[in-house]
Amino acid sequence: MQVILLDKVANLGSLGDQVNVKAGYARNFLVPQGKAVPATKKNVEFFEVRRAELEAKLAEILTAAEARATKINELGSVTIASKSGDEGKLFGSIGTRDIADAVTAAGVEVAKSEVRLPNGVLRTTGEHEVQFQVHSDVFAQLNVVVVAEA
């Protein structure tokens, strides 16, 4: 199925590219999320007219994402208190939602889907490095300090 991309999609292309994808991928993911439209004659003509407008909109979104990433990097670290045992192991774990809530409370709006935990959830006290993917091209980094709750 031929589609026109309205946004940058990993391993596929960027704004304006006409790509061939499987029908299910287009119908169930790309089109509902507003990342693509079917490549009909009408849509191709419509896209060519609006191309500059869409590129400006994407540039604005990218600038906003870079500003948020800078704010996250400037935070330096966020502290989260959790119940733990004697050896520093937590009762339970700290996941993406807990980290997103802590960063949002610190003053930078972050969604849980933007938090990247490559080694899984945090299960020990101490300092952990956490990545944030604010945009497909923009990443930020933050130290999360997990302390034992009194």
Swiss-Prot record:
It holds the Pfam family Ribosomal_L9_N. It comes from the Bacteria. InterPro entries: Ribosomal_bL9, Ribosomal_bL9/RNase_H1_N, Ribosomal_bL9_bac/chp, Ribosomal_bL9_C, Ribosomal_bL9_C_sf, Ribosomal_bL9_N, Ribosomal_bL9_N_sf. GO terms for molecular function: rRNA binding; structural constituent of ribosome. One of its GO terms (cellular component) is ribosome. GO terms for biological process: translation. PROSITE patterns: RIBOSOMAL_L9. Keywords: Ribonucleoprotein, Ribosomal protein, RNA-binding, rRNA-binding. Belongs to the bacterial ribosomal protein bL9 family. PANTHER family: 50S RIBOSOMAL PROTEIN L9. NCBIfam families: L9 (TIGR00158). Binds to the 23S rRNA. HAMAP family: Ribosomal_bL9. This is Large ribosomal subunit protein bL9. It comes from Serratia proteamaculans (strain 568).
